[in-house]
Structure formats: C-alpha cells, structure tokens
Amino acid sequence: MKQYHDLLRSILNHGAEHRDRTGVGTISHFGFQTRFDLREGFPIVTTKRVPFRWVAEELFWFLSGDTSETNLRARGVDIWAEWADEEHTAKFGRPAGDLGPVYGYLWRSFGGDYPEKNGVDQIANLLKQIRTNPDSRRLIVTGWDPRQAENVDLPPCHTLFQFKVESGRVLHCQLYQRSADAFLGVPFNISSYALLTHLIAHVTELEVGDFVYTLGDYHIYKNHLEQVNQLLSREPLPLPQLEINDPNRELRGLEGLLAARYEHVNLIGYQSHGKIAAPVAV
C-alpha cells in the first residue's frame, strides 16, 4: 500500500526528534493527508501482516458502546490490555478492565455522565441523518470530549470523522486523527475506518467511495525505527477486496449495524509479507 509507505517516509525525511509522555521518544511530523478509493480495493497494509479479525472485532466493540477491556479480550483481542490493569484504572477509581469513557462510550453516549448511558448516541443520529438528510454537511461523529479527556489513561487518538453522501448514492468518509503511532496504530486505523465506511454504506444502502485520512501529529517511536526500515524494504502487494455477507439484506439501519459480526465481513485475497513485531509504548 503505497500511501502507507509514503506516510512513513514523510516522517523519516521531514520529521524531528521529540520527547513524549511514554519516555521512549519519537521522530514526529505534523500534518498529513492521503486518500483511499475503496472501490479499488480494501486498504490494509501488505508489507507486514495485519490481523484483520482484531481490526473488525475492535470496531464492533466500539460500535456496541462497550468500554470493558475484559469483554474485548473475550473477543480474542488484547491490544488494550496495557491500559486496563489495576495500576492504570485505579487512578480513576475504576476496577481493572474498565477503561472509562473511551471510543465506544463517546460514540454512543457523548456528553454523558460516565458510566451512565445518558448522553447523545452519535451513531444513531448519524444513520438517521444519512437516511433523512443525506446532503447534510453535519454527518459528524466526534470522540473528543474535553470533559472526559483527563478521565482516561489514553484519550482518543482518532478524534473526529465525517461522512459525505455524493449524488445520493456514494458514501465518503474522512477521519481526523490528532495523534498517530505510525508503525503499530496507523495500519489498524486505516483498515478500521475503511471497514466502518463499508458497514455504514451497507446499512444505509449506499455504495462506498473514498476514505480520506488526515493526521495531526504522526510519529515513529524510536524503538520502531528498525522495524520501519524492514517494512520499507518490502514491496507492496495487491490489495484485497471486502464483501459484506448479508444475502438476505437483513443488516439495515442501527439495528443492523449493531447486529454485524465478524462472520458478516469477508476479506477476499489478502496477501501479505510476514509479521513484524514491535513493542507498544505505554
């Protein structure tokens, strides 16, 4: 996937060294945008193996409104484990496994009094607006609540996404991400929001269009530089295709979106180079 290689090279060629909250240090740059035409293939990195099932299960967990890392782990995904132990959650008076008002809560109960589900269901509102007012320029979901940003160990990195319905039939999505771990996080983020666009298009009976990816601070952790160079030495492979398995067209509207499971998505023809392991900066 050339766009991903371009992103990494942009940091290496133009970035500067920065200190960061983890103490690891980064090579960081600010401001990047790229575009993926979802009709030409599903954007997933091919120069290392990306566990697509983890991408999908995490997204379904977000959409459900759940914030329990224990429940995500039950789906076979442990990528939030570093922020879910008692050492991290006790700082906020929460038990181990309770991540607090992270993505799922903010998407489904924005402005609420955590853990009460008394906020705005942005996903429900989004689907309603796509159906009733597709020309709206307000098809927006935000994950950044200043009241809650200090109430979690890891406030949202991917902070706002907007949809546009073109000509009444094609759905585009743009994501703004305030902070992007280029080696570990970005491959997940690209595929997650591409999948979200496919799902939203399917349940609203639209076609997929473009996914536009806009970054604020995008960075390579210093202990990932060897892995980045290894990845860049590899040649990108052709992109796979994504199909939604819904032959009876049962997945419609909010209920359909929330009923979607990994078994409903089929990534066809994903070929990749081997896995490249790297430590998570906590």
How would you label these PLM feature ranges?
Residues 1-282:
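Terminal, non-catalytic protein-protein interaction segments that mediate quaternary/complex assembly
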